[in-house]
């Protein structure tokens, strides 16, 4: 934790100048399930002619991966590239063609062998991020916060970040809940939005089977709501204060232990 925190502070101190400020970013991947049938309350019954869901579970299984990217500037947030990755056995070519008119310019729907993030896809995302910032003449220095998963730590990813003038900072796996805005404030709300609108689609279509195309459309709406929703700057600032508080508590505890050990050794 100490190394990560010092690294982050060093980057902010070295990059921030009167001419150029720092753009703090956070990237993380989250799994989006394609059905929510396992929860209570899906099947309903009624004596009148209202819409009723039948007791039939969806045969659709699998997940999509949403690569989420947020920053501490609400004006830049809608420009940031977002990626949705689907396994080629789940996300079919005809689904891609049907969804093409509904996908915003900053959202990239990817059909790949695996639904998880890979080094080549992350490099492409860095390239798209740089193009998005340059297209709007964003002069801030991007500092990207990521967890320490093997894909993020790959040498090719580091080189790609250097080419695109993106400064990387990593968070230990056990501390993402404390440091990353995505883990604390964003992803949970995004998944809740998808789950709620999945249920709403079931009611509207009078079926428990919601196809992949509808799930992707719901996710795209969730991404748009996320871009226009919470104050990202406040999220980053609150986490920074929280980290400072926790770090001060840890420092005080270490000093207290040292003092106790010193007194204990002298008494013996």
Predicted region positions:
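Phosphate-facing sequence motifs and polybasic nucleic-acid/acidic-lipid-binding regions
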Residues: 1-266
């Amino acid at each position: 934790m100490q190394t990560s925190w010092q690294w982050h502070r060093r980057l902010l101190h070295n990059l921030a100048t009167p001419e150029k400020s720092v753009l703090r970013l956070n990237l993380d991947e989250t799994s989006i399930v394609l059905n929510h049938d396992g929860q209570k309350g899906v099947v309903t019954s009624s004596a009148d002619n209202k819409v009723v869901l039948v007791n039939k579970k969806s045969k659709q299984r699998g997940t999509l991966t949403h690569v989420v990217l947020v920053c501490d500037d609400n004006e830049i947030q809608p420009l940031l590239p977002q990626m949705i990755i689907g396994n080629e056995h789940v996300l079919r070519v005809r689904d891609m063609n049907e969804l093409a008119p509904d996908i915003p310019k900053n959202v990239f729907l990817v059909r790949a062998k695996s639904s998880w993030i890979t080094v080549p896809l992350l490099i492409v995302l860095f390239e798209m991020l740089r193009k998005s910032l340059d297209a709007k003449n964003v002069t801030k220095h991007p500092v990207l916060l990521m967890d320490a998963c093997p894909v993020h730590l790959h040498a090719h990813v580091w080189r790609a970040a250097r080419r695109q003038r993106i400064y990387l900072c990593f968070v230990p796996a056990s501390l993402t809940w404390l440091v990353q805005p995505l883990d604390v404030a964003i992803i949970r709300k995004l998944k809740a939005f998808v789950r709620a609108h999945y249920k709403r689609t079931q009611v509207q279509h009078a079926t428990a089977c919601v196809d992949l195309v509808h799930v992707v459309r719901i996710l795209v709406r969730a991404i748009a709501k996320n871009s226009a929703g919470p104050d990202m700057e406040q999220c980053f600032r609150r986490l920074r204060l929280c980290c400072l508080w926790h770090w001060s508590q840890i420092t005080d505890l270490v000093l207290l232990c040292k003092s106790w050990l010193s007194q204990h050794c002298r008494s013996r």
